[in-house]
Amino acid sequence: MRICGIKLTHDGAIAVVEDGRRLFCVEQEKRGNGPRYQSVDNLDAVVFALAEHGLNPRDIDQFVIDGWDGENESQFQLLSGAVPVALKGAPYVERHAEGLLDSVDGYGLLLGGEEFPYKSYPHVTGHVASAYSTSPFASAGKPALCLVWDGCIFPRLYYVEPQGARLIGSLFPMIGHAYAAAGLHFGPYRQPNRSSWDLGIAGKLMAYIELGSVDESIVEVFQGLYETRSAADTEQARRYRENINNAEASLAVIHDFFESSALRLKAKRAEDVLASFHVFLERLLVKEIAMVLLRHSSLPGARNLCIAGGCGLNIKWNSALRATGLFDDVWVPPFPNDSGSAIGAACGAMAAQDGFEPLEWSVYSGPALQESEVPPDWEAAPCSLPELASILADNKPVIFLSGCAGLGPRALGGRSILAAPTSPEMKDHLNDIKRREHFRPVVPICLEDRAPEIFSPGTPDPYMLFDHQTRANWRDKIPAVVHLDGSARLQTISRNSPHKIAALLIEFEQLTGIPLLCTTSANLHGRGFFPDAAAACQWGRVEHVWCEGMLWSKTVIKKSSPTERLLSA
């Protein structure tokens, strides 16, 4: 059975699964320097992705579209070539507690001039299915809980077992977008006009809050407003809780929440306000999930937790849940946000047919590197990994391009700017190169077996989804990757991994004794990863690009102007 999952809206992607094995997943932003979060606006993208992998639409047994906003159905308006197409889909959330696998069936998916039937499952179904089917619990045939906290929905807890899944309940009435919305009211991303939405704000705020401190008086303000505006037994609060299918109405309530907060917090620093709001939500999440577990502790698999939805990218909340001791294991896939929704749509269709089964998959299964010509003012020469390690040890950043792109929003080593972590100036230099704010962290990628020596807990974290503290005796040795609070957004990789980044780390370790490098994504500002070496060279902000055994080096070095070095807004 060959299933094609399609995510049409933001973080658009096309994925194909065959007999429980992931064949490929192409996120649109990772194609040709595409804009971040790019949607699928034209169905020709589906035809093109299939053709790249030797398939045409007739080779697909079932097409599945990820659901979106709507109480009973969602609506999509897009193109197929130059032909306008209107499609219907499933809603954002299931219509009843056991309705995760209820589909909306449609016809008229116009691909290459031919119409095809399709199914659509609720958006949350894709999150549940992608998280569980890629988890170690699915591989072992064990049930698990799955927490989905996304965009305009409250955090929802599901019970998933091979035979099916059901909603246990919503944990508390606070939509996932509340975290990013806070940034529109306080701090460097504050906007008087809040009609536009930047999907990148939440991740930036997670870094910015380290400039602040938790103030319990601020937490009390948020707690009080939450109890009266969201959780109270009043008509206004009940209407908010019941109107969950109306995204605009939910956001309006959240903006009103923060406007009321701002009136009470005029004397407080923005960084303290945001740090305190982060902790308010973290405590609420931990408290409410603990209360639910008290009522459902007898469920088999209740100590197994999967996390999905956009809030699954919050490494501090993930770590807080793991630290409660309520769970024996916590699994977060590398694509908890909507970058995993195409895979999730396909997994949802698998589950509807055969139950929730494990997916055979690899994180490095995005677009392959494209061939390209050496640009003017650049030269290319063979370069071994030991030679590359020596360049890095000389404190020279290098763009490292190898293999297929990773799935999800993290570069994970294959589309990365790498640098030695030993200089305190390197963090600022990399942030300047990327035109990022000074408070943004630079990630360490570390050999897995040595991570516990350097970080606490330092447990395996191949997808960069948990928080770690840098041990005191290492902070002066690797200052470029130590965040403001001493933490690190660690990525680990096994010494035995076939990925070339592992072999490079071993070479760097042999040269310096340090088993890690700085890593940050290699991309144009506001765009997906570089698709080829020439694109990285044309960007021109790093003098060396290593691509599959060849070192491309700039022959004419141009100094950046002061204007070029300004951080982008």
UniProtKB/Swiss-Prot annotation:
Protein family: Belongs to the NodU/CmcH family.
Identification of the protein by name: Nodulation protein U
Signal peptide: none
Keyword flag Zinc: no
Function, as annotated: Involved in 6-O-carbamoylation of Nod-factors.
Domain of life, source organism: Bacteria
One GO molecular-function entry: transferase activity
Database matches in PANTHER family: NODULATION PROTEIN U (PTHR34847:SF1)
GO biological process entries: biosynthetic process
Gene3D superfamilies (UniProt xref): 3.30.420.40, Carbamoyltransferase, C-terminal domain
InterPro entries in the cross-refs: Carbam_trans_C, Carbam_trans_C_sf, Carbtransf_dom, NodU/CmcH_Carbamoyltrnsfr, Nodul_NodU
UniProt entry keywords in alphabetical sequence: Nodulation, Transferase
Keyword Lipid metabolism recorded: no
Pfam families listed in its UniProt record: Carbam_trans_C, Carbam_trans_N
Class in the EC hierarchy, top level: transferase
E.C. no: 2.1.3.-
Lineage, top ranks: Bacteria, Pseudomonadati, Pseudomonadota, Alphaproteobacteria, Hyphomicrobiales
